[in-house]
């Protein structure tokens, strides 16, 4: 089947993990307490605070206790949907104020633009909220890349390491899973996507491989497309050169 769409992870794939952990998370941790205090009465924020209480099992938690729970979740790198939503609100304010610019690897910018020009539909699947995803690409250091994407998916579609999530996403995209190529730097995510029927490509920007999947390393010693069993043809993604095959056979 022909590959018609690309579904990509963000952290470690299109963007540096360090941007998320060294820039975004600390920014949210610093600004989230005051943001929650100032906006707790607003409908959108109040709904997420209620979700924190429900998920933590502390139905009577006051605002300060909810803030403490959120900060604990940040420290634990917990993929809690209400936390991601609130972080997204904080980051949105930071992007609007010009304090944040989304990091996207220059090679990823090039590839995304070329893939779009070739008629491929591009989608994002990240543990970060859809709002946060849109901000990273829409307010990136390379400018507004938001128009390149046809849709975004987050943990509301399910955990990234469960195959049912990818089946659900394929259904939302409206394509057979075999016509979608998933890009990630996490082998468990690639496994789940493959189990759902998607094609997969692992990105190992620090070198190495992701067992069981075609892998693009930052310094390949030979044509990765040949090692992956694909025919000729490459599409440069900077130095790591991943290629989207015109046909999956």
From Swiss-Prot:
Any Pfam family hit: Hydrolase
GO biological process: L-methionine salvage from methylthioadenosine
The protein's enzyme class: hydrolase
Cofactor(s) the protein needs: Mg(2+)
Claim: Magnesium is one of the keywords in the record: yes
Transmembrane parts of this sequence: none
Protein name: Enolase-phosphatase E1
Organism per entry: Pseudomonas aeruginosa (strain ATCC 15692 / DSM 22644 / CIP 104116 / JCM 14847 / LMG 12228 / 1C / PRS 101 / PAO1)
